[in-house]
Amino acid sequence: MHRYRSHTCAALRKTDVGSNVRLSGWVHRVRDHGGILFIDLRDHYGITQIVADPDSPAFKVAETVRGEWVIRVDGEVKARAGDAVNTNLPTGEVEIFATEIEVLAAAKELPLPVFGEPDYPEDIRLKYRFLDLRRETLHKNIMSRTKIIAAMRRRMTEIGFNEFTTPILTASSPEGARDFLVPSRIHEGKFYALPQAPQQYKQLLMVAGFDRYFQIAPCFRDEDPRADRLPGEFYQLDLEMSFVTQEEVWETMEPVMRGIFEEFAEGKPVTQQFRRIAYDDAIRTYGSDKPDLRNPIEMQAVTEHFAGSGFKVFANMIANDPKVEVWAIPAKTGGSRAFCDRMNSWAQSEGQPGLGYIFWRKEGDKLEGAGPIAKNIGEERTEAIRTQMGLEDGDACFFVAGLPSKFYKFAGDARTRAGEELNLVDRDRFELAWIIDFPFYEWDEDNKKLDFAHNPFSMPQGGMDALENQDPLAIKAYQYDLVCNGFEIASGSIRNQLPDVMVKAFEKVGLSQQDVEERFGGLYRAFQYGAPPHGGMAAGIDRVIMLLVGAKNLREISLFPMNQQALDLLMNAPSDVSPAQLRDLHIRLAPVQKS
């Protein structure tokens, strides 16, 4: 017999009754029922119940074992009595009567429980991650991660993509976040950078004549952590294609992404035909470029109903600035003063002066609007708003006013809040859509200059003609995002592969041709030698997995994540290094100036 096991802890069934077997694993829990010991033995695959009575030669050792000890058990498979069958376990019809137990490794008193999975302080969980990973839900999440990534690889290979690995040590590149820098020992005063994404390398692969590339790519960005973003590193399904339009990228990747979700959604509905929503429409309708389309609320402009009205707060704003708009946020079934007051209080907690509203109710045979706004704008305007928004008895509508560029995020948050408060969001489905036609440039108010709105390597719609003749802020990019349930899960573009167009695009943000050659020299040189039209995208693997397993944050689907302060509590990183190491790297640490 094998030294440690003949079967795993999930393998035995009623057909194995009478067999002599050997199992090894962790003691999940021990129960004493009238002098008979029951041990739940756990391994990677599952749990099997072990029984030791006082007549068993294994009983003496069984009395000593404690939770999370590692043991080997020899014994006979027996059928459980009818009332003892555990239908929650695949092995629940059998148990092992132990004839021998060997302790392979004892365990100290646990700093956190493995059995039962109660909430526990996250820093303790991360410091003892090797114990945390034994817990059922986290263990299952990590296995789901492995299967989802394997499915991504399989699906990409099936449609003709080839997997390439690109360098981890590369040059620093301004791609929107801070780089992690690696000092060079050989080249004094010089630094490598960990790649924020394989952006330039995958484009170089297209120039090199490879047609379809993909990679499960590690990416490194020194940015502040959020619930939907891990500090330090993350992984993406990175891909690039030659001789394609953006429509062909969508048509290629939509079946892949839909298939991944369907395979792991556990029966939840998945969007069959992904909508394509222009960025400007997404902002005006949902207040976000990553809208949760499970929320049925759609905003509309109602500026005309307030212009010249008796509601002077909005009317005066409209009169003083033609760019001012009023947006309406409909709230089906939200027509109670209590709900409207809660929304108003929430708006104030978000730093807003309030959230104006109208709600409608039947007065006899007549449907009337109520609230301060209805009183001030009058019955005719109130009815016009109700008709435009398609509202009825028991519904409400909230209003925000000002410059859309200033208030759209708050309006989107109000839409989200109303949808959640009124239980309008169907949480048991995955709603995917493409957001397209992103702006190419944006105005950087802090530095009073033009900047790229998204990927600087995107092709502007209209090419050189647009760069030379259009208002920069009106130029759109061949840039697109894939969104799901309020998260951006992928981003991509058709690339700017023409050297003269590339230089002109960077000139608009204050970078000269020399700057372009210095910062993106490899890519710029490559484009001098015949670059095919190409494009691609990158899907955030961590976010996709988080959505599919229903985790509350990314640390719940990652093996060894850092905490919210970007500290690895298990490995104690970042850490001090020796003076000799610093000397080899030509680094001298200056005292930290305390403010």
UniProtKB/Swiss-Prot annotation:
Main localization (coarse): cytoplasm
Region described as Aspartate: 199-202
A GO cellular component annotation in the UniProt record: cytoplasm
Listed GO biological process terms: aspartyl-tRNA aminoacylation
Segments traversing the membrane: none
Keywords: Aminoacyl-tRNA synthetase, ATP-binding, Cytoplasm, Ligase, Nucleotide-binding, Protein biosynthesis
Gene Ontology molecular function, alphabetical: aspartate-tRNA ligase activity; aspartate-tRNA(Asn) ligase activity; ATP binding; nucleic acid binding
Family matches, as InterPro entries: Aa-tRNA-synt_II, aa-tRNA-synth_II, aa-tRNA-synth_II/BPL/LPL, Asp-tRNA-ligase_1, Asp-tRNA-ligase_1_N, Asp/Asn-tRNA-synth_IIb, AspRS_core, GAD-like_sf
Keyword Metal-binding: no
PROSITE patterns according to UniProt: AA_TRNA_LIGASE_II (PS50862)
Locations listed in the record: Cytoplasm
Top-tier EC class: ligase
Catalyses which reaction(s): tRNA(Asx) + L-aspartate + ATP = L-aspartyl-tRNA(Asx) + AMP + diphosphate
Residues binding L-aspartate, per UniProt: 175, 221, 454, 495
Site (Important for tRNA non-discrimination): 33
Chain sites annotated for binding ATP: 221-223, 488, 540-543
Entry's EC annotation: 6.1.1.23
SUPFAM superfamilies: Class II aaRS and biotin synthetases, GAD domain-like, Nucleic acid-binding proteins
Self-association state and partner proteins as the record states: Homodimer.
PANTHER family: ASPARTATE--TRNA LIGASE, MITOCHONDRIAL, ASPARTYL/LYSYL-TRNA SYNTHETASE
Protein's job: Aspartyl-tRNA synthetase with relaxed tRNA specificity since it is able to aspartylate not only its cognate tRNA(Asp) but also tRNA(Asn). Reaction proceeds in two steps: L-aspartate is first activated by ATP to form Asp-AMP and then transferred to the acceptor end of tRNA(Asp/Asn).
NCBIfam families linked to this entry: aspS_bact, PRK00476.1
Similarity comment: Belongs to the class-II aminoacyl-tRNA synthetase family. Type 1 subfamily.
Protein name: Aspartate--tRNA(Asp/Asn) ligase
